[in-house]
C-alpha cells in the first residue's frame, strides 16, 4: 500500500507541478485544499490507530459500497449536467467536499470518486471536479505515504528487505 500511495503522490505532484510551484499565485486555493484534507486525515488516523477500519473490511461491505457510491456518482453527474458549473472553489465547498471524503474511509468507497461526487453536487464542471479531487489528494496521499513509510521504517518486524523493496519501487 505504501508504494502505491507514494507512486500516486508523485504522479499527482508531477502532473500539477505548475499549480503547486506557483504557490504565491494560488495561496487561497492551497488553503482550501488543506482545509478539505483535514477531516479525512484526522478521522482516518483515528480509524487506523484504533483498528476500527479492519473491523468493517470485508468483501460484502466492499461490494455494496462500490455499487452504492458508483450509483451516487452517476446520479450526481447526470442530474447536474444541465447547469453550468462553478469556477470558484469556496471555503464552504472545500469544507463540504472534505467532510464527504470521510466516507472514503469505508472499504469500497473511492476517495476521488466521493470528492468528484461532492463537487458535482455543488455544481462544479466535470473537469473542475476532477482537478479539485486530484489536488485534494496531494496532502492526503502525502500523509498516508509518510505514515506508512514511517511505520515500516520503525516497525520491529521491518526487515532490510522491506526497506529495499520500498526504495526499488521509488
Which residues are covered by each model-predicted region?
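Multi-pass membrane proteins that catalyze or facilitate reactions on polyprenyl-/lipid-phosphate substrates
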Residues: 1-170
